């Protein structure tokens, strides 16, 4: 899984778990079809929709040169009903 960096756990992503939607940060060079293939192959699920967006970059200055630090984008992946990704699904107590 060289395209997916890690799962994201924010307030919004935790709320989306109830709608069977999972959030991942992926490398910016990866295409949507590659990510869909990797998720379906690795987690053994069926993907029905994918939404992606680039996060605002954070500026990083090294003396006179201004650069940026974020080289990834965020994908919200919707699974078919009946499928889930077990390590990311938690019961509330």
Curated annotation (Swiss-Prot):
GO molecular function, one term: structural constituent of ribosome
Family annotation (Gene3D superfamilies): 3.30.70.330
Localization per Swiss-Prot or TrEMBL: Plastid, Chloroplast
Swiss-Prot/TrEMBL keywords: Chloroplast, Plastid, Ribonucleoprotein, Ribosomal protein, RNA-binding, rRNA-binding
Classification via SUPFAM superfamilies: Ribosomal proteins S24e, L23 and L15e
Family annotation (InterPro entries): Nucleotide-bd_a/b_plait_sf (IPR012677), Ribosomal_uL23-like (IPR013025), Ribosomal_uL23/eL15/eS24_sf (IPR012678), Ribosomal_uL23_CS (IPR001014)
GO cellular component, one term: chloroplast
Primary location recorded for the protein, binned into one broad class: plastid
Biological-process GO terms, alphabetical: translation
Role of this protein: Binds to 23S rRNA.
Similarity annotation: Belongs to the universal ribosomal protein uL23 family.
Subunit structure: Part of the 50S ribosomal subunit.
Protein name: Large ribosomal subunit protein uL23cz/uL23cy
Organism: Phaseolus angularis (Azuki bean)
């Amino acid at each position: 899984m060289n395209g997916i960096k890690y799962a994201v756990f924010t307030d919004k992503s935790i709320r989306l778990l109830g709608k069977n939607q999972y959030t991942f940060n992926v490398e910016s060079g990866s295409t949507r079809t590659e990510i869909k293939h990797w998720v379906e192959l690795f987690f053994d699920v069926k993907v029905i929709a994918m939404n992606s967006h680039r996060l605002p970059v954070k500026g990083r200055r090294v003396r006179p040169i201004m650069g940026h630090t974020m080289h990834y984008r965020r994908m919200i992946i919707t699974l078919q009903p009946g499928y889930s990704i077990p390590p990311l699904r938690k019961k509330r107590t």
